[in-house]
Amino acid sequence: MVRKLNKTYAPSTRNGTIKGQVKSARGKNLIYGKHRCGKGRNARGIITARHRGGGHKRLYRKIDFRRNKKNIYGRIITIEYDPNRNAHICLIHYRNGEKGYILHPRGTIIGDTIVSGTEVSIKIGNALPLTEMPLGTAIHNLEITRGKGGQLARAAGAVAKLIAKEGKSATLKLPSGEVRLISKNCSATVGQVGNVGVNQKSLGRAGAQRWLGKRPVVRGVVMNPVDHPHGGGEGRAPIGRKKPTTPWGYPALGRKTRKGNKYSDKFILRHRRKQQRI
């Protein structure tokens, strides 16, 4: 996606970037109102997820993660911005008159055709089961359970790789580096998710972060002892503990949080912490 630098009219725009995108009229039957309640709070109003709150109002775009319109060709009409995710989305017009949103595959442009099914070509944007894909195919929007819809590799720039097929399972390397088994009957979309350079975007000012619903991040060492275990002391003081902790006193920075007896451990061949090139 093309990115442009702002002119230096003001400090807030001096370091910001603008991303080129296609704007279009939104389909009324694909967009819903979204009530954002909580802002990082639980049912008692206590903060459980820090640094969240505020932000501009959003409308939810209904995304088709299932891709269950089999053998019905569709054409990409627009490439749009979605405030609910960092990837762009495409508005698809199908031959049967229906419309739908999908994640924008990298490399596709307005006017391209896509289709989903069991006997479709290996083309960017097409969705088909893993049994019909050759080894080494780059995929995204990957299902974990057949028919449930894509749940893996959906972020901007995400891509998984099909590296083996044996028996009823297929071996895939996920964007995190994890290698795991998934049923060959699960479906995925060919290609990589678009908007690859989103992590290199410069917002230019703090207010742009607040528009996204992100609040300031304050170090615990500069707080008071009542606010954080690292706080207090005279001047610039160390944390005063052997190991760093969370604001609630739990171990942080290196403590494993995954359950040791999780049922899906048997499907993981190589954990993401032990990344090796394949």
Swiss-Prot record:
Q: Write the lineage as a comma-separated list.
A: Eukaryota, Viridiplantae, Streptophyta, Embryophyta, Tracheophyta
Q: What is this protein called?
A: Large ribosomal subunit protein uL2c
GO process annotations (BP): mitochondrial translation
Annotated region (Disordered) at: 224-256
SUPFAM superfamilies assigned: Nucleic acid-binding proteins, Translation proteins SH3-like domain
Keywords tagged on the record: Plastid, Ribonucleoprotein, Ribosomal protein
- Protein localization: Plastid
> Where does it primarily localize?
plastid
Gene3D superfamilies for this protein: 2.30.30.30, Nucleic acid-binding proteins (2.40.50.140), Ribosomal protein L2, domain 3 (4.10.950.10)
| GO MF annotations in UniProt | RNA binding; structural constituent of ribosome; transferase activity
Q: Does the keyword Ribonucleoprotein apply?
A: yes
Source species = Cuscuta exaltata (Tall dodder)
Q: Is Ribosomal protein set as a keyword in this record?
A: yes
Q: Which NCBIfam families match?
A: rplB_bact (TIGR01171)
Q: Which domain of life is it from?
A: Eukaryota
Question: Could you describe the subunit structure of this protein?
Answer: Part of the 50S ribosomal subunit.
> Can you tell me which family this protein belongs to?
Belongs to the universal ribosomal protein uL2 family.
- Pfam families (UniProt xref): Ribosomal_L2, Ribosomal_L2_C
Q: Which GO terms describe its cellular component?
A: mitochondrial large ribosomal subunit; plastid
